Amino acid sequence: LFSTVTHSLKSIESEQLAHIQTLTANAAERTENIQRILANTGVKIPEKLAQADLDPDSAIGGPYEAPETTEMFENSISELDLALDQFEKVKSFARKLPFNNPAPGKQITSLFGNRVDPFFGRLAMHAGIDFRQKTGNDVRATGDGVVVTAGAMGGYGYMVEIDHGNGITTRYGHLSKILVDKGDTVSEGDIIALSGSTGRSTGPHLHYEVRRNGQAV
């Protein structure tokens, strides 16, 4: 009887350990996926987030064998905690970046890149994306950040610029009304302005830019 109970307990422990190891691997894979997406967009992940603060002995491998002590089980729990912690940190970092839509549901009328300039009729670089919006429609922040510009800015007309950190900023142009001030802290989804046709514009729309280290991307 004792032998049967011992065998059953070992079997349960083995199943639990295998499940924990699977969860750890899944968390690590999700973290790597987020890091890869950010790297492809040119966003540099802070070094403290890029690598988990793991013990050197955690970089090990080999075929699975059922543990004879609780040490392996406890180590696996610790590794899972570290993997989940890193995943949450990287996910939180990514969520602060401007990956959302400033004009949900609105038609895109002009893409980023070279196009025929609507005023000069010749090829010119368009540094953002234009969304069809009526004057007075809501314009939303695409990520958390701090307002660094809020006012008239030449061809942009009334414009808001938000600093999201890590060299990333967003610009919202041709606004009819600005609802934030320079220095304000905003969150993703906040209404920061109303669309319009101020500045160098042929009609009501939202001009939206993402810049990395000052360069439109």
Task: Give, region by region, the residue ranges found by the protein language model.
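Non-catalytic extracellular/periplasmic "stalk"
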Residues: L1-Q107, L111
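Catalytic cores of peptidoglycan-degrading enzymes
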Residues: F87, F93-V217
